[in-house]
Swiss-Prot record:
Family in the record: Belongs to the class I-like SAM-binding methyltransferase superfamily. rRNA adenine N(6)-methyltransferase family.
The name this protein goes by in its record: Dimethyladenosine transferase
Function, in words: Specifically dimethylates two adjacent adenosines in the loop of a conserved hairpin near the 3'-end of 18S rRNA in the 40S particle.
Source taxonomy: Eukaryota, Fungi, Dikarya, Ascomycota, Saccharomycotina
Catalytic activity entry: adenosine(1779)/adenosine(1780) in 18S rRNA + 4 S-adenosyl-L-methionine = N(6)-dimethyladenosine(1779)/N(6)-dimethyladenosine(1780) in 18S rRNA + 4 S-adenosyl-L-homocysteine + 4 H(+)
Species, as recorded: Kluyveromyces lactis (strain ATCC 8585 / CBS 2359 / DSM 70799 / NBRC 1267 / NRRL Y-1140 / WM37)
Pfam family, one: RrnaAD
Length: 320
């Protein structure tokens, strides 16, 4: 993973200058909505987001997509340091101008580059008016940090936020819901209307709090995610139906052979032959023993998926 270009800047400005700053920006360049550039212009909403993070004076805060700095200047007032990851050099330049020469000059560092390709330093808190097209990969990158943040306060498209919060049986419950809720506690903070942004997006937004579970569940992320990818292909089909796909069976057969090799086990057929039938039998065995064959993924909770994963591992079936 490549490192982003580092540029250190610092400083903050008063919220009273925000309107003039935004008007100036519209005459300088056009916001790129394809990059999710919708600047949060409501100072009350911005302050509310920062307050919900409960930043400590000793905290290092990661901000993703700072834009012109309406959140940044407020975070700088409370944190020891802010690391802001910005993709657009124009935005980084505007933020630099805004914070230049202020008392907190040495507290801001800008990393110029793609967040998903950026090697992140240590941070305690994450705050983001998230570019909506990277919402899902952003969440999983935060969850999979070696030392995840204590809390993340993130603005998302309303429907995406509701998927994060959805419970089994809800219409929006999906692989994203089950996956994130395995590793983190998610709560809804506030709704944010489209008119709070410049330019206004086409959809409403919501702010959520994500707190990574500590200690982390003793489950391999890739195994868990691999299982969910199979059962949620069509969440309203039975669990058993998800395992009948030829592609799924071929992947599980390959993984099963790899497992046997690590165990120095001797398969019932020669190594070059197909073990599909053996894998099918093991799948049927696990589904029968767990009693989940006819249940639908959209109705299953975390305990159900853990039963499945444990049962498959017991018979040598792996998903990553």
């Amino acid at each position: 993973m490549g490192k982003a270009v580092k540029k250190k800047y610092s400083g903050a400005s008063s919220g009273g200058k925000e309107v003039d700053a935004e008007k100036h920006l519209t005459t300088v360049f056009k916001f790129n909505t394809d990059l999710g550039q919708h600047i949060l212009k409501n100072p009350l909403v911005a302050q509310g987001i920062v307050d919900k993070a409960q930043i400590k004076p000793s905290d290092i805060v990661l901000e993703i997509g700072p834009g012109t700095g309406n959140l940044t200047v407020r975070i700088l007032e409370q944190a020891r340091k802010v690391v802001a990851v910005e993709f657009d050099p124009r935005m980084a330049a505007e933020l630099t101008k805004r914070v230049h020469g202020t008392p907190v000059e040495k507290k801001l560092e800008i990393l110029l580059g793609d967040f998903m390709k950026t090697e992140l330093p240590y941070f305690d808190v994450c705050i983001s008016n998230t570019p909506y097209q990277i919402s899902s990969p952003l969440v999983f990158k935060l969850i999979n940090q070696p030392k995840p943040p204590r809390v993340s306060i993130l603005m998302f498209q309303r429907e995406f936020a509701m998927r994060l919060l959805a419970r089994p049986g809800d219409s929006l419950y999906c692989r994203l819901s089950a996956n994130v809720q395995m590793w983190a506690n998610v709560t809804h903070i506030m709704k944010v209307g489209k008119n709070n942004f410049r330019p206004p997006p086409k959809v409403e937004s919501s702010v959520v709090r994500i707190e990574i579970k500590n200690p982390r569940p003793q489950v391999d992320f890739n195994e868990w995610d691999g299982l969910l990818r199979i059962v949620f292909v069509r969440k309203n089909r039975t669990i058993a139906a998800g395992f009948k796909s030829t592609t799924v069976l071929e992947i599980l057969e390959k993984n099963y052979k790899a497992f046997l090799a690590t165990q120095s086990a001797v398969p019932t057929t020669s190594s070059g032959d197909s073990l599909i039938n053996e894998v099918k039998e093991k799948i049927e065995q696990v589904l029968s023993e767990t009693g989940l064959a006819e249940k639908r993924a959209g109705k299953c909770d975390q305990t159900d998926f853990l039963k499945l994963l444990y049962g498959f591992h017991q018979v040598g079936i792996h998903f990553a």
